[in-house]
Amino acid sequence: GDVVLSGQGGAGLAGVYLRTNPLTVSGGNFTVQGASLVGGIATGMPGTAATGGSYGFQVNTAPISVSGEIDIRGQGTSAGYFGIFSDSTITSTAGNISLIGKGDGGVSLTAAVTAGSGALVRNLSIVGTGTAGDGIHASAAAPLVATGGVSLTGYGMTVGFGLNLLGAVSSTVAGDIVLSGRAT
């Protein structure tokens, strides 16, 4: 079935934190609850680190594997903290993936994100807003792959890149790759 996580952290505590153990969802969707968006994430929301230094959604050696849709939204607070921060693979075998993060940095990924498998055409969308850092940062160890389209939208303010992509970005079956980055 479906898995829905909603959390709000305080100083030093992430809104939602997955650690050490894999998260596997068979036959369902995985959602970290979101909120209405105005220019990124406008207000506090489930999955938000409300006060102090913390990530909105943090993954530490806890691979995520889902058969259905993945929808994750996170808002971080304070210097150095991202809306979404993941060092583990995020995979949907038969669904689309949407990641939306806002914080000092928007979305930071150091492991692969993969939407779809085989001939199933599925899409990957990532939107990141960094108030003092990168909108989207993907390391060389973090290829962003979809069988369908890939859309990456990053807004970096002050000292960040809109899109800081060090790894591969690819569509393996049929889809467009759309990159949109802005830095101010």
Where is each model-derived feature located?
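Short intrinsically disordered, low-complexity coil segments enriched in acidic
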Residues: 1-8, 184
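Acidic/polar low-complexity surface segments
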Residues: 10-15, 31-57, 75-81, 124, ...
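Detector for repetitive beta-architecture
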Residues: 2-4, 15, 22, 27-29, ...
